[in-house]
Amino acid sequence: MSRKHLTARQQEIFDFLKHHIDTTGMPPTRVEIAREIGFKSPNAAEEHLKALARKGYIEMLSGTSRGIRILINNDNEDVTQDLSLPLIGKVAAGTPIMAIEHVESHYPVNGAMFNPNADYLLKVNGNSMEKIGILDGDLLAVHKTNFARNGQVVVARVEDEVTVKRLEKKGELIYLHPENDELQPIIVDPRLKYIEIEGIAVGVIRNNAWM
């Protein structure tokens, strides 16, 4: 597919989008784009995003948290493909997330919605991550991995329980931070308590977009 060339500023924003997704697992907000690029207003970021969408480099999604989808990879190749991802409901204590009894159904998505790729969708229970737009009933797209960087939103298993939180490693301790001012972080000493990273969040599908 032939695409129009980007201006220097559009290329800068496009590169930031890809870098932010690679490092955090999610697209940036308009405010984050404006702060990074030096715009005075998020509206300026919005206009450049619309230009990127018109030129075929991204798609702006409704019903999706941080609704930006990259349409080409670093080699300027199309990455769109249809997938059917398992939808995971409530995870029983001490059992693998992908156990067959947890799969409620399969949900069709376009593979380009998520970078890195999503391996499954996890139904969100509660509002512990509401400040970053992950709400009760949403579907959290998860990339399976045991490695995560500080600041990424992870699916973590602490003892027998699975939780979605923002990761911070500090010294010997691991902090799992909620994005809700009414809740406290989970603090884990891996020497005393079992903890494993089971995946990183790579996107969100709003509950009213699939229910």
Curated annotation (Swiss-Prot):
The keyword DNA damage applies. GO terms for biological process: DNA repair; DNA replication; negative regulation of DNA-templated transcription; proteolysis; SOS response. SUPFAM superfamilies: LexA/Signal peptidase, Winged helix' DNA-binding domain. InterPro entries: LexA, LexA-like, LexA/Signal_pep-like_sf, LexA_DNA-bd_dom, LexA_repressor, Peptidase_S24_LexA, Peptidase_S24_S26A/B/C, WH-like_DNA-bd_sf. Residues 30-50 bind DNA. Represses a number of genes involved in the response to DNA damage (SOS response), including recA and lexA. In the presence of single-stranded DNA, RecA interacts with LexA causing an autocatalytic cleavage which disrupts the DNA-binding part of LexA, leading to derepression of the SOS regulon and eventually DNA repair. This is LexA repressor. It comes from Haemophilus ducreyi (strain 35000HP / ATCC 700724).
